[in-house]
């Protein structure tokens, strides 16, 4: 048996539908669970009842994919209302979403991309992101954590490095950061494929070192897939060894921030997620 260090990070898993019943039956030792906020927006029903059961046994973190914090058209009022209601009902330990956009306007009508799309790292995009984050925090009356994105395109209009951009966001809004370690590595691998990053691991460690430690409220860990011409953050496999290396560096830098194992594609047995969570505790 591996002894857990006294100063080990708090670690949770993403609680997905295939494991709803099994988790509640087994009640394994976990520091917290995380769910996708939008899956529980319905008023009442089986999903919310299940989440309430989980909340009775574990602290819950709400992780969103739909606020579209970087969208110039602003925050969707209905979406924010549903999130605020869920936060009031569940009283989560953390609430988070992504530094991305998903909504825009075409021919006078709003459209939704149904995906997490990257934003440029420049002053104009920062102004939009800050305004939207502030609106969410004012509505929820609590701090929001903002996650760095896995981005498959870059913008010629970007004139800031991502860590500097995120640091400025936290300074202006008081929000925190959810640092997705796998996303950092996926982006570096794709930059290597594009001929712009000779040493992805070193680039990731530099990225981590550039982030203000006090702003980091949580880490994400996940797997990715190399398609040959692009690396995809698919959350469909175990955490890769280079990501563990970056994670160890991040924990030393950020002071053992809470960490979460994400697995959303080809979801395995619950035992596999628990094994990964145990590694995050002891790595």
Language-model features, listed with the residues they occupy:
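Boundary/entry segment of secreted carbohydrate-active catalytic domains
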Residues: 1-22
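Gly/Pro-rich active-site loop or hairpin
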Residues: 42-44, 74, 116-126, 187-254
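Acidic-and-aromatic substrate-binding clefts and catalytic sites of carbohydrate-active enzymes
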Residues: 18-20, 37-49, 68-78, 152-160, ...
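Hydrophobic faces of well-ordered beta-strands that scaffold small-molecule active sites
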Residues: 9-15, 31-35, 60-63, 93-97, ...
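Acidic (Asp/Glu)-rich catalytic clusters
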Residues: 22-28, 45-62, 78-93, 134-139, ...
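C-terminal helical cap(s) of enzyme catalytic domains, especially alpha/beta-barrels
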Residues: 270-283
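Acidic/histidine-rich catalytic cores of soluble enzymes
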Residues: 137-229
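Active-site acidic/histidine proton-transfer and metal-coordination neighborhood
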Residues: 76-177, 241
